[in-house]
Amino acid sequence: MVSRIVLLDAGPLGLVSNPKPSQQNLACAAWLQRLLESGVRVIVPEIADYEVRRELLRANKQPGLMLLDTLAEALDYLPLSTAAMRQAARLWASARQSGQPTASDNTIDGDVILAAQAQSLDVSDLVIATTNVGHLSRFVPAQLWTEIEPLT
């Protein structure tokens, strides 16, 4: 039996890899622990790792980088693939053809890459945990991380 799969978008991944003990960071870390304890399979997509990692590197936040590395090793990690990137290109083009782009034309669109990574798993019980459902929910199931419950 396949359990529910939750992919972490950059928002929640950034919260759980932030060593600062803010209320939101601690709440997100506790939420992640509850998911794991209930049997939810939590995955770090490579595009989300990239988005969080580049900012941690820019700001020279070594403790955050260490936490991010630990998470990437402790959880399942979904590397980018040629198939996912080609699907992302199709999603990007389709969004523009329908007059609803998800990012400006000259940026790498992390949302469509994340959506394509999620689609590449080809499973029915999957959701992306995010802090901004908007663009993602056009392509794949996405919810605010605060609304995703552990398995019962």
Please provide the spans of the model-predicted regions.
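Short, well-structured N-terminal submotif of metal-dependent ribonuclease cores
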Residues: 1-44, 54-70
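A generic structural signal for short hydrophobic patches within well-formed alpha-helices
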Residues: 13, 49-52, 85, 136
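Short beta-strand scaffold positions
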Residues: 44, 79, 109, 130-131
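Acidic catalytic patch
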Residues: 74-103
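Short acidic-hydrophobic, aromatic-tinged amphipathic segments that line or gate anion-handling sites
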Residues: 76-81, 144-151
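Acidic, metal-associated active-site segment
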Residues: 106-126
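Short loop/helix-cap segments at secondary-structure boundaries that form the rim of catalytic
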Residues: 136-142
